[in-house]
């Protein structure tokens, strides 16, 4: 046996087969729609952290799938759905209850699981109960996607066994359908996160409307792109969302405001961008100085 041979390395890769997702770069770019949809809700300071974590879990899932760890990839998709549901669960309740539930979550005390959170939201949540009534097909989709993802996570079917998929008899079989199935769940998960983000506030969609954009410059939020909505949310789901009380109330609250002209709007955007960059650099530099002082 060669001195360079390491059994451990061979064994770790024996039943692992890498996969290539077509046009994978597009998914990373599309996820920026969610990453840049910052919420300015002061009563839920961790909202953006939860949404960004959900996005990171999708990124992890893509990486894991291409490395060949497909069940872990599906697990990360499920986690992404659960995390986006958790912040909606925490946001769609009275302030006094939110504080108590947030402490339970932080301290890893008893906390409802995905299905329990959704059931409670359907019964007691003001925003989600209304969304479910207006967007029933979307919430059916969450249930179906989660159920099917669990089939892979719980290894139901030999196609989800590493030793079967990568057996010499099967290893040369075409993986096209296997990859397509994963991509389908990937895209549906991105869509679910994008819509759950809209249960916090409707600005990613409101600001798609120029009539609102020029009346309400929300420095925290970037609007979803039309292409992103068409691919992941669908125009039909968006149409249903615009029937919700939250969307209508926000829309009516802004449409009566004075409409800015483009020159004023572009100045505000430019001013905020420069201020944001300067503030971010200042915060980074202060952290660096503190870190340097502690280090030395």
Predicted segments, located by residue:
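Short, charge-rich amphipathic alpha-helical segments embedded
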Residues: 76, 82-98
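A cross-kingdom marker of C-terminal helix-rich interaction/assembly modules
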Residues: 1-70, 75, 96-296
């Amino acid at each position: 046996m060669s001195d360079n041979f390491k059994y451990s390395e061979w064994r770790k890769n024996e039943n692992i087969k890498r996969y290539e997702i077509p046009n994978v770069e597009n998914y990373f770019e599309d996820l920026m729609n969610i990453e840049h949809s910052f919420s300015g809700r002061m009563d839920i300071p961790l909202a953006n952290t939860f949404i960004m974590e959900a996005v990171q879990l999708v990124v992890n899932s893509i990486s894991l799938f291409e490395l060949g760890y497909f069940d872990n990839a599906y697990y990360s998709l499920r986690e992404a759905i659960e995390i986006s549901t958790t912040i909606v669960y925490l946001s769609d309740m009275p302030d006094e209850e939110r504080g108590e539930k947030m402490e339970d979550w932080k301290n890893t005390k008893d906390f409802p699981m995905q299905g329990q959170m959704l059931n409670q939201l359907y019964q007691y949540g003001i925003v989600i109960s209304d969304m479910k009534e207006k967007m029933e097909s979307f919430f059916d989709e969450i249930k179906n996607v989660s159920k099917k993802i669990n089939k892979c996570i719980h290894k139901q079917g030999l196609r989800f066994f590493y030793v079967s998929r990568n057996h010499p008899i099967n290893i040369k079989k075409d993986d096209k359908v296997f990859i397509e199935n994963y991509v389908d769940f990937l895209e549906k998960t991105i869509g679910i996160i994008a819509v759950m983000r809209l249960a916090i506030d409707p600005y990613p969609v409101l600001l798609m409307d120029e009539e609102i954009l020029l009346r309400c410059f929300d420095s925290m939020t970037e609007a979803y792109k039309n292409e992103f909505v068409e691919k992941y949310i669908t125009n039909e789901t968006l149409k249903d969302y615009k029937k919700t009380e939250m969307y209508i109330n926000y829309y009516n609250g802004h449409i009566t405001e004075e409409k800015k002209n483009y020159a004023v709007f572009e100045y505000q955007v430019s001013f905020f961008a420069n201020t944001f960059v300067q503030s971010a650099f200042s915060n980074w530099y202060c952290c660096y100085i503190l870190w340097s002082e502690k280090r030395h």
